[in-house]
Amino acid sequence: MKPKTIIEKIWENHVVYREDGKPDLLYIDLHLVHEVTSPQAFEGLRQKGRKVRRPDLTFATMDHNVPTVNRLVIEDEVARNQIAALERNCREFSIPLADLRSEEQGIVHVIGPELGLTQPGKTIVCGDSHTSTHGAFGALAFGIGTSEVEHVLATQTLWQHKPKTLQIRINGKLGEGVTAKDVILAIIGRYGVDVGTGYIIEFTGEVIRNMSMEERMTICNMSIEAGARAGLVSPDETTFAYLRGRKYAPKGEEFEKAVERWRALATDEGAEYDKTIEIDASTIAPMVTWGTNPSMSTSIEGTVPYPEDFSSETEQKAVRRALEYMGLEPGTPITEIPVQHVFIGSCTNSRISDLREAAKIVKGKKVAKGVRALVVPGSQQVKKQAEEEGLAQIFIDAGFEWRDSGCSACLGMNPDIIPEGEHCASTSNRNFEGRQGKGARTHLVSPAMAAAAAIYGHFVDVRKLQKEPVH
């Protein structure tokens, strides 16, 4: 039998209907729902007199629009209406909901894994582009639009053209202070925001195998910023250990049977990809974005580039515009860029390991004068654990604001807006113009780099800093 990639195995396992020249109809194992992209979908069902086909394969939470302070008092009318609509829709259609009073509430791509809803071999969709996060478990996870949300609610299926396969193999060992966030920023920085266009990426190699599940989630989360339809990692013992005992994961003998099935999903030896990229881990350093898309980045040792450094006129024009928006001069060392805001959070970097890494930098120090720093845990469970471990107190003692869970300052859709013209060191995934608020200037970094920027008031090389034990 011809060796297959995990991508081919999961895809073929889920094809319900196929016709030459048309997209495949895929069965969907898990549909995650939030308050922003679902109201019109539910309204569509209502108007057509349809039910949700599989409420038991659907799970909802509220994350994008929720305040992270006084969360039950929602002043914005649009946000208030969206949250009320989700509560009403979940009641009417019998969908499980982790609402603002629930201990299970959080960012949808944080709670799916921590509750054990996310499992190897599943097809997973959500009306959010960073659904690719769940691919870290060896799942095929896509972001979908509102009309597709309605289609999945009604039929538990999705029409999809089968993408090509791209292997990104990261060999060797990462240097001290280099994180999963730096790896994915380096990939996008070197190969561009369209390297994955038309592909599903499988991340392989020694570096990926040595990563925790939370680090793999960071990598897969930003597959979308590389242009891919999805990104994933073949499941292994690290995956199974993470899932064991989680609320919605199989239990006892059923779990052992599931592990047998999950093991068989891994890409076969000799399987062929449409394209392969190899990266030497030792060439990756802590990264900082300087521009207005995630490929506009350099290492902490670098400088803001000159437009003339780029070969094409189109690139030069884009760089000029980005530098103007960001208020940066070519040739400026990255370490001399001042920051006025720091945001540690988002579906990319708001898990317990992210907060531990940031706390190691922060412990015993103070936030620099003129810097406002937020730490927003990705879920209420992460918040509780961080408080129990003493991490929250480390941040509070240093002058950080410690918040409830939500998407927060990742996107300018809730009260946590970055003011116009001010620079934010952010652990999120997008640095587009206006992403964190009108005129906000976003620099994407790892949690450790963001924490260091908060303490020093500008970017610093975390490899040169003393880290304190935190637990």
From Swiss-Prot:
[4Fe-4S] cluster binds at C347, C407, C410. The keyword ATP-binding does not apply. It comes from the Bacteria. The keyword ATP-binding does not apply. One of its GO terms (molecular function) is metal ion binding. Pathway: Amino-acid biosynthesis; L-leucine biosynthesis; L-leucine from 3-methyl-2-oxobutanoate: step 2/4. CDD domains: IPMI. It is an enzyme of class 4 (lyase). It catalyses: (2R,3S)-3-isopropylmalate = (2S)-2-isopropylmalate. InterPro entries: 3-IsopropMal_deHydase_lsu, Acnase/IPM_dHydase_lsu_aba_1/3, Acoase/IPM_deHydtase_lsu_aba, Aconitase_4Fe-4S_BS, Aconitase_4Fe-4S_dom, IPM_dehydratase_rel_enz, IPMI_cat. It holds the Pfam family Aconitase. Its EC number is 4.2.1.33. Binds 1 [4Fe-4S] cluster per subunit. GO terms for biological process: L-leucine biosynthetic process. Its cofactor is [4Fe-4S] cluster. Keywords: 4Fe-4S, Amino-acid biosynthesis, Branched-chain amino acid biosynthesis, Iron, Iron-sulfur, Leucine biosynthesis, Lyase, Metal-binding. Heterodimer of LeuC and LeuD. Catalyzes the isomerization between 2-isopropylmalate and 3-isopropylmalate, via the formation of 2-isopropylmaleate. HAMAP family: LeuC_type1. Belongs to the aconitase/IPM isomerase family. LeuC type 1 subfamily. This is 3-isopropylmalate dehydratase large subunit.
